[in-house]
Amino acid sequence: MAVARTGVLGVQWLQRASWNMMPLGARTASHMTKDMFPGPYPRTPEERAAAAKKYNMRVEDYEPYPDDGMGYGDYPKLPDRSQHERDPWYSWDQPDLRLNWGEPMHWHLDMFNRNRVDTSPIPVSWNVMCMQLFGFLAFMIFMCWVGEVYPVYQPVGPKQYPYNNLYLERGGDPSKEPERVVHYEI
């Protein structure tokens, strides 16, 4: 415990001592450049063409988010499709996100990446899935009801006891000879 405490104190001292001499690498590399921020909303066709060129898009395909004060600026409005729908066999520059270098990312990429929402079409429609689910549940409830109404037990024979069918233990007269009981073996 003391060694761990000493190590933590040593690292903290080193960070405080070296703070004025050199900045942390993660801090200097994590800032966003002015090119990464969306520009103002394009009002003229020239501004629209410049914004399309900025995002590596054709002017016909470029459509910005509406200027409703949410701060989207000139960022392109891309279709709401998840990364699952993109070709998994294509040679992407970033295969985990299925993106190429310079390609604009969706504004809500954190929602549409591959471990979140999947917007790809489902092979079976919702009404068919619901019919299958509720049909299975109804069948199982029906079978449970049938099992309650008509119980099934293993067939058994009459109970057999040793020592002349426990004649004395079951209140038999000790002065009389009990009747002979034949036990059958199965």
From Swiss-Prot:
Its main location: mitochondrion. It comes from the Eukaryota. It is a single-pass membrane protein. It holds the Pfam family NDUF_B8. One of its GO terms (biological process) is mitochondrial electron transport, NADH to ubiquinone. Keywords: Electron transport, Membrane, Mitochondrion, Mitochondrion inner membrane, Respiratory chain, Transit peptide, Transmembrane, Transmembrane helix, Transport. Residues 1-28 form a transit peptide. The keyword Mitochondrion applies. GO terms for cellular component: mitochondrial inner membrane; respiratory chain complex I. The chain crosses the membrane at residues 133-153. The keyword Transport applies. Signal peptide: none annotated. It is found in: Mitochondrion inner membrane. Accessory subunit of the mitochondrial membrane respiratory chain NADH dehydrogenase (Complex I), that is believed not to be involved in catalysis. Complex I functions in the transfer of electrons from NADH to the respiratory chain. The immediate electron acceptor for the enzyme is believed to be ubiquinone. PANTHER family: NADH DEHYDROGENASE [UBIQUINONE] 1 BETA SUBCOMPLEX SUBUNIT 8, MITOCHONDRIAL, NADH-UBIQUINONE OXIDOREDUCTASE ASHI SUBUNIT. Complex I is composed of 45 different subunits. Belongs to the complex I NDUFB8 subunit family. This is NADH dehydrogenase [ubiquinone] 1 beta subcomplex subunit 8, mitochondrial. It comes from Pongo pygmaeus.
